[in-house]
C-alpha cells in the first residue's frame, strides 16, 4: 500500500497542476472586451468612452483588446461632427477599435438624404450586432454601459 501512495498522490495532484497552469496562462493573456453603444443619448456615449478609457488605464494598452461597436442610434458617436470625436481619436491611438454598422449607415443615408460623415477611426462592419455576436463567440466579454 505504501508504494502506491506516491503514485496516488501524483495522480490526484496532476489535475490541480494543470488547472493552475491554465489559470496562469489566462492571467497573462490580454483581456478581450466589446462595448456596445446603440443609444444616441450623449450621456451614454460619454459613459461608453469613460469605460473604454478606464479599461485601457487599468490594464494598459497592450493588455486589453477593446472594441466599441456602434449601431442603431448609437452610430452618432462615430459621426465626424460628434462632440466626442477627439476622445474617439485618443482612444483609437491606444488601440481601441471603433466599429461602425453599415446597415445603420445605409438606413441613416435614406433618412438623412445623404451618407453620414463618419470619424476617420470608424471601421466599417456589415452588421453591428453580428460583430458583437462574433466577438463574444471568440471569447470577448460584452459590456453594455
Predicted regions and their residues:
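Secreted/extracellular ectodomain signature
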Residues: 22-145
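Positively charged n-region of N-terminal signal peptides that target proteins for export
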Residues: 1-4
Amino acid at each position: 500500500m505504501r508504494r502506491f501512495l506516491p503514485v496516488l498522490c501524483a495522480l490526484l495532484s496532476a489535475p490541480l497542476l494543470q488547472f493552475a497552469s491554465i489559470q496562469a496562462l489566462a492571467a497573462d493573456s490580454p483581456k478581450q472586451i466589446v462595448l456596445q453603444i446603440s443609444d444616441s443619448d450623449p450621456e451614454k456615449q460619454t459613459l461608453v468612452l469613460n469605460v473604454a478609457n478606464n479599461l485601457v488605464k487599468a490594464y494598459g494598452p497592450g493588455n486589453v483588446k477593446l472594441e466599441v461597436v456602434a449601431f442603431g442610434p448609437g452610430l452618432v458617436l462615430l459621426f465626424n461632427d460628434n462632440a466626442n470625436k477627439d476622445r474617439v481619436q485618443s482612444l483609437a491611438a491606444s488601440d481601441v477599435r471603433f466599429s461602425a454598422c453599415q446597415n445603420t449607415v445605409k438606413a441613416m443615408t435614406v433618412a438623412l438624404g445623404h451618407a453620414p460623415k463618419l470619424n476617420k477611426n470608424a471601421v466599417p462592419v456589415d452588421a453591428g450586432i453580428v460583430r458583437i455576436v462574433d466577438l463574444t463567440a471568440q471569447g470577448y466579454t460584452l459590456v453594455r454601459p
